[in-house]
């Protein structure tokens, strides 16, 4: 069996991603963890934080089989395009951010890594740098030639997956088609089985409209699209309940009897999850041929370099990736 090792991308270099990597390196890890970033950036940020971390250089040809000792971090050096001023965005480094993601993602495809864990990027500055970018999820789908991926966040026993992700609200209803809903539901079900080890996943499905459309008086998407699609999938044996009004679904009566929730759009499902577990939640991309988890927060430019940050979400992202790799092996 191939040794398990994992890639870690710090994301936006001016944000807290480098800080998280360094603080994490002070704790022992069960598997080799390779930060794909600039060695100079980590050296600079460690000095700002007052953290003593030994940086151990590796290349694709010299990847380790054993975890680094606590207080050490493996680094696959990736050069910056411009010096980093902590807390200050610089569009000149947009391509650098994407290069780290490409190295990690391609490394997973090539079998160098068992999975990748990503710290937050800043979508705006990447686009300002002249590169069209809507998020990790979409970028990795393109890199891996995956037609459909699913964004899921989890904290504790609550998992919330999304039918649509980063769309303006006015475009959401048109994006919810029977084909998309069926593909997303199948991916969610399959990955709950294959990557999370849940033999018979129970999935609750939100309606799109208030009161799940109120029998068509507040919208017909539930009647025309959602219910017929769910019924077709139920006939194949999938355990699906819904469409349910979101404000009813997200109550203990329902959540106690499900393994995942499928929400129709970003701000329908994620506020509840983040209220329950912000700082202790993980973002998982389902449907990829690789394992990818991420933190549940942003770049926190104002906290970068201060050591006043919580590594909780990154630790959960790491633990989730480890567990998924163990289940999937």
Swiss-Prot record:
* Cofactor(s) needed for function: Zn(2+); Mg(2+); Co(2+)
Summary of subunit composition and partner proteins: Homodimer.
Q: Where in the cell is it found?
A: Cytoplasm
Organism field: Pseudomonas syringae pv. tomato (strain ATCC BAA-871 / DC3000)
What is the protein name stated in its UniProt record? 4-hydroxythreonine-4-phosphate dehydrogenase
At the top level, the lineage of the source is Bacteria
GO MF terms listed in the record are: 4-hydroxythreonine-4-phosphate dehydrogenase activity; cobalt ion binding; magnesium ion binding; NAD binding; zinc ion binding
General remark: The active site is located at the dimer interface.
Pathway-wise, it operates in: Cofactor biosynthesis; pyridoxine 5'-phosphate biosynthesis; pyridoxine 5'-phosphate from D-erythrose 4-phosphate: step 4/5
